[in-house]
Regions:
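Terminal catalytic/cofactor-binding subdomain
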Residues: 1-157, 166, 285
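Loop-rich catalytic cores of soluble enzymes, especially ATP-dependent carboxylate-amine ligases
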Residues: 129-285
């Protein structure tokens, strides 16, 4: 049976030497039809599926398929292209040595997307919140785990579905060397987060108009599953450590388990509950 110590040791096993340290970037974006300002569809003549086949011709490899045997990810040289709800496209970059390399990687990715966009009269938009679409106008991609999230989100906040369909971001990932280094980086990142949000806020538009909120993205995240989202007080203190993070994560409701290749709803269980006993698929339903 899985123990709390196993989870703590997982983080310890991820320590990296300073010489081998790396960074990674996750880059999300919206894609619109320029003519009608509608978001790109999942399938069709000009769609995510068609875009994926275009990228395969550029050297990307097929990745994961959904339960309908539709392609939902690509990979190449340690990087991947995946889908967020609402047909948002995400580059999950490979581990690189510095920001110059991740800049080159991101621009190469955007260059490939722009080539497809120009051929098909599409617009690529890098904003924190969709400035045009209403929530009900955005297509949910047929991805099994997103179905579970879609059903659960309204129970734990009023804006979770907006987060899923109408927000984008850029995320930075950093290696850590030991417990002290992890604490220093994690606490500093959380303390700096409000400043970073203010500096880079770029989403003052919502459903075609300016609504006086400088960052609709942050506004949306403030009421999205508050048990797991937001800046927690314990994340600001230098007494923070791996065990405290594990304690926090164990009490959060779990979204799903993958059992026999299928995503199964576990939203009524915390991670701690699932550690105590792994329920069978039929008992979860």
């Amino acid at each position: 049976m899985l123990q709390k110590s196993d989870l703590i040791n997982y983080f310890y096993s991820s320590f990296t030497s300073p010489e081998a340290k790396g960074i990674g970037t996750e880059h999300e974006k919206f894609i619109f039809h320029c003519a009608n300002k509608k978001r790109i569809e999942f399938d069709g003549s000009v769609s995510i599926q068609n875009l994926f086949h275009f990228l395969i011709e550029k050297g990307w490899q097929k990745g994961e398929y959904n339960s309908f045997n539709q392609l939902i990810s690509l990979s190449k040289n340690g990087a991947s292209v995946t889908l967020e709800p609402g047909c948002k496209l995400e580059l999950s970059g490979k581990i690189l040595k510095n920001v110059h390399q991740t800049c080159t990687e991101t621009y190469e990715h955007l260059r490939e997307l722009q080539e497809y966009a120009e051929l098909n009269n599409l617009c690529i938009l890098g904003l924190g919140f969709d400035p045009i679409s209403k929530r009900e106008d955005v297509e949910f991609i047929p991805k099994d785990r997103y179905r579970i999230m879609r059903e659960f989100m309204p129970k734990v906040g009023s804006r979770g579905l907006d987060m899923m369909t109408r927000t984008c971001t850029v995320q930075a990932n950093f290696d850590y060397f030991d417990q002290e280094d992890l604490t220093k980086k994690f606490v500093l990142a959380n303390r700096l987060q409000p400043i970073v949000m203010a500096i880079f806020c770029n989403s003052p538009f919502r459903e075609g108009s300016h609504n006086s909120i400088k960052s609709n993205r942050i506004y949306t995240w403030q009421d999205t599953d508050t048990q797991r989202c937001g800046i927690k007080e314990e994340f600001l203190d230098h007494s923070f450590n791996i065990e405290k993070y594990v304690d926090f994560a164990l009490e959060v409701k779990n979204y799903f388990l993958k059992i026999n290749g299928k995503y199964v709803d576990t939203t009524s269980y915390s991670f701690y509950d699932l550690m105590s006993k792994t329920p069978k698929e039929e008992s979860i339903r």
